[in-house]
Amino acid sequence: MSRSRKETVTCPKCGKESDITIWDTLNAEMNPKEKQQLLDGTIFRFMCECGYTAGIDAGMLYHNMTRHTMVYYVSEESVEQTENMFADIRKHGEFEMADYKYRIVTSQNALREKAAILENDLDDRVMELVKLFYYVHVHEQHPEEEIDEVLFFTEGGQWLLQFLGSASMTAELPVEFYEKIRDQYAARLEEAGNEGLHINARWAVRFLGYDED
């Protein structure tokens, strides 16, 4: 089930009041239009008739029933509370949710990326490993650039990685490379399990035994 609410905002440019929709819970199957807005980022954007645009920051629980996955975008201050909530669901939840994956993210970019990974039926653990290998390669090729974040997204059916930092760069991600990493680490990933709540760059660094510094 999806849950949304209306809020009224005032445009700081023209002063006009507008109603916006805040999605507290978004079900991918029940709301395909809003799912696409999440994928392209517009669901977190306010656009006034005068042309003014601004970001909207609000937490969201994203539910993809097809992939048996819930992703919760929360503030850093709410992480522990969300961890406890997911622990309770695992302990007392309905039987059909026993094989669900639960993830916690603390940025809109990370939520959009998780949604894109689910949309393409990929494993976010494998994707984090792929991104880490690309990060190391790009850092070696461009040591002068600071890379703050690497994000997976798709465009026109093409898999891409975006490098955000002192300079924005984009690289194509061949399907074959993803499959190579998936197969190479399949046994270790199976052994590690898929119950982690925080599957991100730090997880990938720890999984590969790299120095987090």
Question: Model-found features: residue ranges?
Answer:
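N-terminal cysteine/histidine-rich coordination modules
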Residues: M1-E76
